[in-house]
Amino acid sequence: MKTEDDEMEYEASKEETVSEDKDFDDGIDYRTVIKENIFTMWYKTSLHGEFATLNCVITPKDQNLLQHIFDEDIQTSEAPQTVVLQGAAGIGKTTLLKKAVLEWADGNLYQQFTHVFYLNGKEISQVKEKSFAQLISKHWPSSEGPIEQVLSKPSSLLFIIDSFDELDFSFEEPQFALCKDWTQISPVSFLISSLLRKVMLPESYLLVATRSTAWKRLVPLLQKPQRVKLSGLSKNARMDYIHHLLKDKAWATSAIYSLRMNWRLFHMCHVCHMCQMICAVLKGQVEKGGRVEETCKTSTALFTYYICSLFPRIPVGCVTLPNETLLRSLCKAAVEGIWTMKHVLYQQNLRKHELTREDILLFLDAKVLQQDTEYENCYMFTHLHVQEFFAALFYLLRENLEEQDYPSEPFENLYLLLESNHIHDPHLEQMKCFLFGLLNKDRVRQLEETFNLTISMEVREELLACLEGLEKDDSSLSQLRFQDLLHCIYETQDQEFITQALMYFQKIIVRVDEEPQLRIYSFCLKHCHTLKTMRLTARADLKNMLDTAEMCLEGAAVQVIHYWQDLFSVLHTNESLIEMDLYESRLDESLMKILNEELSHPKCKLQKLIFRAVDFLNGCQDFTFLASNKKVTHLDLKETDLGVNGLKTLCEALKCKGCKLRVLRLASCDLNVARCQKLSNALQTNRSLVFLNLSLNNLSNDGVKSLCEVLENPNSSLERLALASCGLTKAGCKVLSSALTKSKRLTHLCLSDNVLEDEGIKLLSHTLKHPQCTLQSLVLRSCSFTPIGSEHLSTALLHNRSLVHLDLGQNKLADNGVKLLCHSLQQPHCNLQELELMSCVLTSKACGDLASVLVNNSNLWSLDLGHNILDDAGLNILCDALRNPNCHVQRLGLENCGLTPGCCQDLLGILSNNKSVIQMNLMKNALDHESIKNLCKVLRSPTCKMEFLALDKKEILKKKIKKFLVDVRINNPHLVIGPECPNTESGCWWNYF
């Protein structure tokens, strides 16, 4: 179809149909033509042996879906004008759309539309310029009358755009360049963009089909789209279909289990003809004496068998083999298409990659490529996964890599490929897996024998170098990327490579939801010998893994337990592993038993164990390993119900001399008075524990009383105690105050979020005056006291010589309360070093008193005034003090202090002239672009002493600001700018506990 011919034809028809007054029929002729075209196309397809597949994907569920996609929304009472039909390659989108057109033509569907127009992305991409009327009139019969009259009533029209993902358009046209006139000849890309954006024919309806990978490119063009996903065969339907294809029920059950153990292959089976292909490969391998489980172990193994079967090595009647140059050209076309998400090879693509018609015929005969049945100058790989396989092979067949300083094309950059993940770059994921799988020596040997060539393995060393670089890039070490990476590394089935690949990773984050993931992680992680920290979320217990009859094969349960044993064996085989976090895991009796055995192993070197928010099934909590494991010093059970058995085994372990726990975190563990008393009894004989966090438990005054008995014990080793939000009141402060004077070791106490009031603060203040009080840090955040409490604390500070950290945040001290405190803080013998006054209802009036403290207290090095409305005037007062050479404050918190661009000069003064302030928090202030720009001009100087500056994440990510921050990072690399301070346990220094 040539553009020039179409234009001539259109001009001729235009002269014949100038009258808009002509009466024409209800579109029966057009409906007939449309039906004939679709049936002709289906007939051509059936000649290629694919007619069964076309019918297979049309299920009653899909037909029901078609009937309701334009129904009114129940809440808005509006019918969607734009619907997107989304699904994987080969799932049946095109078939479903053509079925919809046929149903309309037969009068069974969408009768609210007088005309339905079907537009295919493959065809549209080959057209350069036309009017929209020309574009849709290819099959318009003359008996219908002028198409212009039809287009004049857009609210009764439905436009179906098939294969949006194949449209080779950028869709970056500015709004003013779009076209409203459907008679105007324009670039076809402009026409389609205008239609999608509702500039042309805005009242019309759209039904757009696309692969999932193109959704992000499509959605910005649409107005209020409704998305409908085609899911293909369900899990049960897949299993039934595999049974049907393999006939032999016993063998089919084994195949299903093997396929389900490889979630990639099992997922591929949701597309009918992929399921057929996979089962055909399994049949072929079994007939040759192969084992189903070995063929299914990796997706690369199965596809290598399949690709090699397309080029049989027989002397008579064999398919002509492509030479290495031809194979490389095909692979390059494949990889370029995968990266750009373009899966149709047009004439220009063939010329670009130097593929002749004879070359194409070779791959057509081998069933690697197929010719489009409608558009004869379009070629595609027989399936997306076949294209992905050849795309991966490209990286093994590249030549002259040493002559390139930089990759000439983005798709040649292996580092970019490894950086990708299945959420943001789903189109690259399977190709990446195939690439790693092709490092396997058996796969390479198969391909070398099939294609009679030698494959270089230089890419192996390239990948290892990229993995090393990936580990050094902190932004790449997300759970998402690492899990993707493990799936890829597993494909190699090469223990030596896996060991080399994982030697760069000291910290990993993985999640196990299903048995296939467990198999992969258990295989890979035991080869990660440099691993120091492992965060594992185990959500799949044994019962859930064996949830179907097909899975319950003989020995399956034993195999699953073996995988868990393999995974947790790293606790004793990896001597560098010192921390394990089982955050949000579900642990049953079997897993708890395995864990206990591994943690009790004499070679276990683990020091820190975290069971945060863990769900122990059927009360299987068991911490008996603590009695014999002398290495574990840190146990965190936050947000985990200890249960009866958990508390019992924990208390028994704490009583044992072999238990060496130093840190125990039991925040939000559903502890009450009775449980607290049992814990306190166990602690009476414990000599190792130095940190205990019991926050967010309803201990009340009685529970705290039993803890005070522990503190009064001269043999107690407790140094830090956190009792935030434990129901403590002023009545409990009396017994606590008494214990504080008798405790010889306690240095840190957190009582935040308890209603102590002024009376409770008075009792604690009396204790602070006592010479025997050893407290160094006291956290009284949100304890409901007033300036009266401040006065008590102020008096205590005049006598106390040990306290260096005081947190009074979220109490209504007001300016008067702070004034009382400042009187004591300015005294030369006051040893306080860190003062937290967040959300204390302070104003600029308090800044004068605070400024005096900054000048007169040489010990104070950290002051947090966040969430107080100090305004620019308050900062101005503080800045005068900060410029004083006697001021030694290093850390200054000014988050949400009502600062505006008017304070910019004062901030610049702090950054330029103050030599002590090295950390500052400016988040949640109304600093504009110009203010941050000016700050960056000072921060970029290598002489700037600032080490950390906290700014809002949304500000940091703004394009206008980003370039200034990059400049700062280049010129002043020791400075960190971000919303969180690095290298601190809590993540932010202003959050102490």
From Swiss-Prot:
Localization of this protein: Cytoplasm
GO molecular function ontology, one term from the record: ATP binding
UniProt GO cellular component terms: cytoplasm
Keyword Flavoprotein: no
SUPFAM superfamilies for the chain: P-loop containing nucleoside triphosphate hydrolases, RNI-like
Xref: SMART domains: LRR_RI
UniProt KW keywords: ATP-binding, Cytoplasm, Developmental protein, Differentiation, Leucine-rich repeat, Nucleotide-binding, Repeat, Spermatogenesis
Domain NACHT residues, every copy: 81-403
Residues that coordinate or bind ATP: G87, A88, A89, G90, I91, G92, K93, T94
GO biological process, one term: cell differentiation
Tissue specificity as recorded in UniProt: Detected in adult ovary and testis. Detected in oocytes and in germ cell elements in seminiferous tubules in adult testis (at protein level).
Family: Belongs to the NLRP family.
Function according to Swiss-Prot or TrEMBL: May be involved in inflammation and spermatogenesis.
Stated name of the protein: NACHT, LRR and PYD domains-containing protein 14
Lineage of the organism: Eukaryota, Metazoa, Chordata, Craniata, Vertebrata
